[in-house]
């Protein structure tokens, strides 16, 4: 189901509650959610299998200020160049953002919806970021994909004491749309 302005308070409550199961999850406010550049509230999808919110995901179009343009290919990639986007081509990419679900099954339904929306809007790629330990990752891996392994680093301007001590076993929240 598409999000709407009247759902924003409930969406924010869900994100704050369920999001706490991930490390580094943002402390969303209604104002912050309404003011994300390029993210329309109706691009948020909400899962309500039993009436209550069980999951949220958004399609965030940042093409107005963030683009990927193929500059060329080198090394072994030159061999595949005829099958890849042309040099100079703009890749229309959107981000799966605000990912928060109570279960992989709920996430699977939301991801299907957001993939369909991305296809309908003619995006070439849907970019998604998940921690390697995230129980939602196997669902995303079920789609044709390219993995780009990365490391998250925690930086601190003080001695980092309290932040470092709060890290635990929970998967990190990685929203690559905000990077």
Predicted regions and their residues:
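Short hydrophobic/aromatic beta-strand element in the GNAT-like acyltransferase core
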Residues: 41-46, 56
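Short loop/turn motifs at secondary-structure junctions and domain boundaries
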Residues: 35-39
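Short amphipathic alpha-helix that is part of the acyltransferase structural core
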Residues: 1-31, 52-53, 94, 169-179
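Active-site/acyl-donor-binding loops of N-acyltransferases
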Residues: 1, 49, 55-179
